[in-house]
């Protein structure tokens, strides 16, 4: 039987809206009664009826007919339920006018949670997912449990790719594996680090108290985990101030463990580019802001390295990315104006030098904002950082107003979508894009809670509802988060470790209408764009995981814990 209910499979916050949908086409298979005559009940795990409600045709400002999934949605709302408990949704007949008669239950959902604890648990799981992506170090059983593994891919003495025409060896130890593969990249690592540093910067007290580290649930705090990647970044800084592009195996690994991969082929440094150098400069300048209270020496190292990289980029503004994708991802970027904006804004937050003003004003003219961050388009870092700094109120005001415009556009798009999301095309990494849009709302919510009568917190949480289960394919897209989580991600560690369960806390890319993996034998549940997700290991187009998708989800969860 198809599941007729679309809801957040993990939970809802007590004081937040609690909206779910039913699909009329699926209900028709269960009853002859029209949807308007059906009722729903919210029932606690002890059997207490907490709420009884009816359905409204459509969803949000949408009429309810979802083009991308061929579903007709009706809305149920149990926001009145504030009691913290585990509960389920029952779809019932014969409630009205049948006093003393137990209603006929047509369908009952799996249990979910009303409470605050689930958000903290998901935050910890997301942060720990980066620990599981660590390269070059042992993952101890006391922290990693059944996913423990020996140190592999030390990368502490590796050569340079032949296309670099460079002799010698380099220490590139540490860092995170990027996604489902064993490459380590500065560009995609940069947007991930920058996003997590924003979370640290904005939620320092609350997040660090939740994620103190040293436990099974949380081996390292958010700042400590990010520092592991930053130390790798610092090793990728060349003597001249340029930053190497990536560490890559010679060829694509099969689905084996890091240990087996390490024995089977060499790993190499590949490329040095303006884009990687500016990603480094922006990330390290942000790191200086985050760590200066706790570790002034490390913050100083970061800022000095950022300055060196920025100077190299000024002298080398058009050094291309290495156009080699044999064994690792490309991350090609032919426009670095947005990275210059990011690097300058981060520098300005540390050192508001007079010489930066005209450059930042020009950056703001030529780098209009996007609805969310992306590894190729990083200008929102510039806008966000300027909105948060207090050195110049004029720049701050302009940045905030600009981001408010983005937030309003996101909410407008959500209101018009059947499922309440703001993307208009399901692409590779759609869950990352949705999470990044939610992050824009969460950041603007820090200084403005409503725009044109629409609450930013409400619409931010609606995006997360999609990620955690309220979607056409009925998956909670984070591994280990719910009964419906992916179990076969396109993730080499999860398939090479001999453990049945995948590494927890990983966000799958999600629905992708382009289906680039059809030749791999992937079977999708339907032909429509909204059904383009398959929990199958070959599905790199929909079921791969990546640190740049986990990072915005982590940041949003951190900001929700802050509030």
Model-identified regions with their sequence ranges:
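Aromatic (Trp/Tyr) and acidic
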Residues: 5-99, 103, 110, 128-190, ...
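Short beta-strand edge segments in extracellular beta-sheet folds
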Residues: 112-117
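Extracellular C-terminal loop/segment signatures of secreted glycoproteins
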Residues: 122-127
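Short coil/linker segments at helix-helix boundaries
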Residues: 198-228, 266, 286-303
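Carboxylate/His-rich catalytic cores and anion/metal-binding grooves
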Residues: 220-242
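HEAT/HEAT-like alpha-solenoid repeats
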Residues: 234, 311-314, 361, 365, ...
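Hydrophobic, small-residue-rich alpha-helical packing segments that form membrane-like cores
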Residues: 307-311, 317-318
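Zinc-dependent metallopeptidase catalytic helix centered on the HExxH motif
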Residues: 371-375
